[in-house]
């Protein structure tokens, strides 16, 4: 377990453990939900022995484990005696907030015997009291939005790179084949001069320098690119602040062969210069070899 970070996520039902674990997954943690406490030492040992060593583990342990949960304090003592280092993240919220969340989700509290939500909350607070006292970090999510909780988790458990971890994909496509279903933003570049109507350029693609020169030489292109890069200089930090981890930019022309390819590659170059993580993919390039794919 040397060098392996073991994070135990626990806390009140409805306090945001599910959202926290999703964020931890985005940060590269290997996450397991509702693992019986007695299995924690063996699980950690197996992770340390894997060929591709798992360096960060997050385990959700809470009262859903029923009678198994009663062993959690003893298990934590055993981990400490064995020299296995761990951290405990405890999430909680006010009764008022938890009641509202349970009503919105229309789910019963797991410890409520009479159907009264507050009864279940108070019973859970009592059951978790000792575990809360061992927590390395307690987060009260009463006034947190999901995005704010994700940002807090990233600040606590992500490195500097993780805090600005946004995986960007720029996809060129042809409108004749449909807009990519996973697109977050769609940019229509069909207003730019079309190389398809130049006989010497028609058989080429946006990967070829003559096509790139043709597209970039147009005054309209120059003005558009200036606006486009300013747009993303503004948008990307906002997405990161909001906790977004993936962003798909779809850039389309008629057939996905010329203009969209040029612009997707250009955008990739610009964002890499700004130290963003971006992959460029040309979805429809080479899809139609009949000469109609423009």
Curated annotation (Swiss-Prot):
Keywords attached to this entry: ATP-binding, GTP-binding, Nucleotide-binding
Top-level taxonomic group: Bacteria
Binding residue positions for ATP: 11-18
GO molecular function: ATP binding; GTP binding
Binding site for GTP: 62-65
InterPro entries: P-loop_NTPase (IPR027417), RapZ-like (IPR005337), RapZ-like_N (IPR053930), RapZ_C (IPR053931)
Homology family: Belongs to the RapZ-like family.
Function description: Displays ATPase and GTPase activities.
Designated name of the protein: Nucleotide-binding protein Daud_0300
Lineage: Bacteria, Bacillati, Bacillota, Clostridia, Thermoanaerobacterales
């Amino acid at each position: 377990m040397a060098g392996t970070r073991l994070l135990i996520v626990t806390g009140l039902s409805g306090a945001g453990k599910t959202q926290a674990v999703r964020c931890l997954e985005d940060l590269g943690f290997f996450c397991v939900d509702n693992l019986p406490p007695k299995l924690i030492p063996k699980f950690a040992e197996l992770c340390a022995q894997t060929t591709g060593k798992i360096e960060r583990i997050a385990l959700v342990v809470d009262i859903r484990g029923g009678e198994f949960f009663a062993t959690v304090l003893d298990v934590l003592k055993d981990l400490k005696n064995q020299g296995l280092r761990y951290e405990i993240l405890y999430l909680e919220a006010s009764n008022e907030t938890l009641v509202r969340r349970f009503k919105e989700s229309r789910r019963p509290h797991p410890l409520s015997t009479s159907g009264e939500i507050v009864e279940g909350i108070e019973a859970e607070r009592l059951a978790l009291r000792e575990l809360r006292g061992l927590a390395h970090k307690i987060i009260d999510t009463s006034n947190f939005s999901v995005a704010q909780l994700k940002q807090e988790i990233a600040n606590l458990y992500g490195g500097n790179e993780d805090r600005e971890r946004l995986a960007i994909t720029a996809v060129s496509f042809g409108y004749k084949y449909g807009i990519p279903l996973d697109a977050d933003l769609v940019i229509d570049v069909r207003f730019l001069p079309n190389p398809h109507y130049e006989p010497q350029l028609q058989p080429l693609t946006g990967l070829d320098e003559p096509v790139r020169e043709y597209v970039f030489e147009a005054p309209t292109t120059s003005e558009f690119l200036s606006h486009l890069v300013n747009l993303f200089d503004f948008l990307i930090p906002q997405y990161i602040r909001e906790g977004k981890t993936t962003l798909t930019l779809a850039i389309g022309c008629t057939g996905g062969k010329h203009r969209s390819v040029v612009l997707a590659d250009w955008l990739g170059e610009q964002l890499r210069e700004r130290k963003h993580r971006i992959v460029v993919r040309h979805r429809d390039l080479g899809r139609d070899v009949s000469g109609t794919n423009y």
